[in-house]
Amino acid sequence: MEIKEEGTSEEGQHFLPAAQANDPEDIQFTSIQKIPNEPQLEFILACRDLVAPVSDRKLNTVVQISVIHPVEQTLTRYSSTEIVEGTKDPLFLTGVTFPPDYPIYEETRIKLTVYDVKDKSHDTRSFLGCASFKVGELLKSKEQLLSLSLRTSDGGKVVGTIEVSLVKMGEIEDGDTDHITTDVQGQKCALMYESTAPESLSGKENLPFMNAVLRNPVCKLYRFPTSDNKWMRIREQMSESILSFHIPKELISLHIKEDLCRNQELKELGDLSPHWDNLRKNVLSHCDQMVTMYQDILTELSKETGSSFKSSSSKGEKTLEFVPVNLHLQRMQVHSPHLKDALYDVITVGAPAAHFQGFKNGGLRKLLHRFETERRNTGYQFIYYSPENTAKAKEVLSSINQLQPLIATHADLLLTSASQRSPDSLKSSLKLLSEKTELFVHAFKDQLVRSALLALYTARPGGILKKPPSPNVSTEEKSTQHDTPQLRRQDSIPHHSDYDEEEWDRVWANVGKSLNCIIAKVDKLIERDSHNEEGAGGSSSKDGEADHTLEDSITSHPREDWYEQLHPLILTLKECMGEVVNRAKQSLTFVLLQELAYSLPQCLMLTLRRDIVFSQALAGLVCGFIIKLHTSLHDPGFLQQLHTVGLIVQYEGLLSTYSDEIGMLEDMAVGISDLRKVAFKITEATSNDVLPVLTGRREHYVVEVKLPATVFESLPLQIKEGQLLHVYPVLFNVGINEQQTLAERFGDVSLQESINQENFELVQEYYSIFMEKMPPDYISHFQEQTDLKGLLDNLHQNIQAKKRKNVEIMWLAATICRKLNGIRFTCCKSAKDRTSMSVTLEQCSILRDEHQLHKDFFIRALDCMRSRQTQGALNESDDPETGCLTDNKPTSRHFYPVALLLVSSHLLVVWLILSLALLLAKYQ
């Protein structure tokens, strides 16, 4: 129902004093003192003794809130309460809240207009009365409560009273809370709250951190009665995230860098036979086109300004493919009289999917399976490596790229410790160097590397083997290497006229030998140093003579001897490591060349689709991780769980298994699964730029999250030292719309069933790790508070039950996630209708189960949260789903559809048909 306000500019003048109306520029306006990032002003409303137009009529009242701006001197509709039926003393559960950036001052006047709604379906209502007040009057009132007379439009007859009570979220004051009843007519007016925010939400040091992530917050305020007839306050907040565009741009930049590097590595393979050289040229041509396309997309994304999210109307735009649809934070802050303030966050986002690519042939799950099946079942004219081997090659290359710089860094730290002549520091640096080097050596033990070296040898000009190599060829079978024709010497491997497989064993074994030399030298230096110290304190003459001899041997070297003696060994280690890396990279690059040569252009198109879906999923994950970290910084148990176990990330999917949404679900399943290759690292921010930084390549990414210095210092040592923090993404999907009904009756729901079963096993795996790694005292307390085992069993039973539209799966998965301190996501096609229904239902269920919401008010609370009228009648341009991405519109355009009054699809079709008929009749 749209509230229509007539003569807004005239009424604005009417309610303004003459001085303000005529000379607004000469007036100094007084800002409202507020907590940073908190709403500037919040109040709730109640009416008393309303006079009905007809004596025997029961009123159905709604209040329209409008703002008279002192500068523009115009009246702007701002929001509405819900409709309260059948009483002359309505107490409204929906309050009014003004976000931090809203231009409101003490001189701003608020107009309250009360209507009697006669027929909601036909938008029939009548004006009852109105009143107005200045914001400063409310703030400075003795009890921060105003009682205003409602008058008719001519300003004459009094038709009742409206009471305005200021709200400050926080602790409740002593008051008549025990006298609140569940009867609407008997409820008392709002009680005052002191302004106290949860510790993790206050504090100026965190503001840059959150402001770098969230934008354009829009708040809603409610008050609901508890089961013991007391009030609890609820604030809903919806925020956009700047990460919607920041993360895709970071990721595309990494893709470009990685692909350019791969192309260069292909060029540096050296001379190849004509057959392989032609294949390489073809691959490079396609890869260059791919890089150019990514560069064009990045350029277009860099031009985007204005809104921080992509609306669903833009989900098919090519330049915005990598950007998630409707990424928002939906936060519910609850203050109840008995319990500590609580926050409940859900990230809402459209299902990660390649909408521009389309779903005619299915989504990633089906396309990848078909691609790999065809590759297995087809013979080719060149050496073939299975998908497992190409994946292994990428994994080894990823390990090389991660470990080589780490080893170099630890080697330099070892030399620094040596120059400082610090035994303890030397031991610590040596331990880290040894661990990373052992991992490095172990990575090259894989048989694939040996096979790839041989395959590359055969691809050289004249390099022909008597039989083709295989990734699983044994050492005995590879004895034919000595029968190969002579190959001219090059910088690339092999360096012998005949391929010598044992040479590779010697090369990578040299890395281990170099490390052993360093370990032996460090042990010797530390031992001599300890003997020297013991000799200095010796008492016997015999010991003194021995110590004197040892002192001579030690002092014959200058004190920087440690550095000088270790430096050549470190150089040798780096040289050996460099030789191994060069050979391994070339051989494994050749494996990838074979994959690309076979699969063009399908392989690159699948890579593009996977990159698009992963980008959308990653943007949401980073947003959720940062928000979860921010709200839990003062929770030692959470921080310990973060670095000990990692975080579970639960995605609630509401896609049907019908038509295009099957492809979306297949895309989404792969995109969320790919998030397992993402790790987080927390660092100290050294500047005002606290946006997350992304590093890595397609097989492994690290997201660097920056924290202010004061916050960073309070973290556990393991996190401060840069330990990688892992996530465990899981997806549970239950289709709930009409299309799912068709799928269950006439189609196939096996995709949904298999996804739910697979991800249940992942949840069980996480639970096992959680119970194993967390401290016993924490586990003991945790088990006392939560029957997680019972929840898991119940979830498993529901998954096995194969019940139609079994939303119990969603509720159980969400509960398990919250109990495990996880990150919650809710997704449907566009994060609109189904998502909003799910989120509001979940919020009301939490209020009922965790905060004692009165059972008689559950439906009314749900209606309040779903009512579009509580934020006023939005124009088409105010709807975030119809606005242009780059338009600079008022903040109201961003209000999230969680609060919209939603209709089912068939009713929407009827409405469209009727609208078209009316238009035709009008113009005829």
Curated annotation (Swiss-Prot):
UniProt activity-regulation remark: Strongly inhibited by inositol hexakisphosphate.
Biased composition (Basic and acidic residues): 1-13, 475-498, 542-551
The keyword Lipid metabolism appears for this protein: yes
One of the protein's GO biological processes: intracellular calcium ion homeostasis
Alphabetic keyword roster: Hydrolase, Lipid metabolism
Record region (Disordered): 1-20, 464-498, 529-551
Superkingdom, natural source: Eukaryota
Recorded metabolic or biological pathway in which this protein acts: Signal transduction; phosphatidylinositol signaling pathway
Gene Ontology MF: a single term: inositol-1,3,4-trisphosphate 4-phosphatase activity
Reaction catalyzed: a 1,2-diacyl-sn-glycero-3-phospho-(1D-myo-inositol-3,4-bisphosphate) + H2O = a 1,2-diacyl-sn-glycero-3-phospho-(1D-myo-inositol-3-phosphate) + phosphate; 1D-myo-inositol 1,3,4-trisphosphate + H2O = 1D-myo-inositol 1,3-bisphosphate + phosphate; 1D-myo-inositol 3,4-bisphosphate + H2O = 1D-myo-inositol 3-phosphate + phosphate
Annotated ranges, domain C2: 23-148
EC number: 3.1.3.66
Enzyme class: hydrolase
Job of this protein: Catalyzes the hydrolysis of the 4-position phosphate of phosphatidylinositol 3,4-bisphosphate, inositol 1,3,4-trisphosphate and inositol 3,4-bisphosphate. Plays a role in the late stages of macropinocytosis by dephosphorylating phosphatidylinositol 3,4-bisphosphate in membrane ruffles. Antagonizes the PI3K-AKT/PKB signaling pathway by dephosphorylating phosphoinositides and thereby modulating cell cycle progression and cell survival.
Family: Belongs to the inositol 3,4-bisphosphate 4-phosphatase family.
Protein name: Type II inositol 3,4-bisphosphate 4-phosphatase
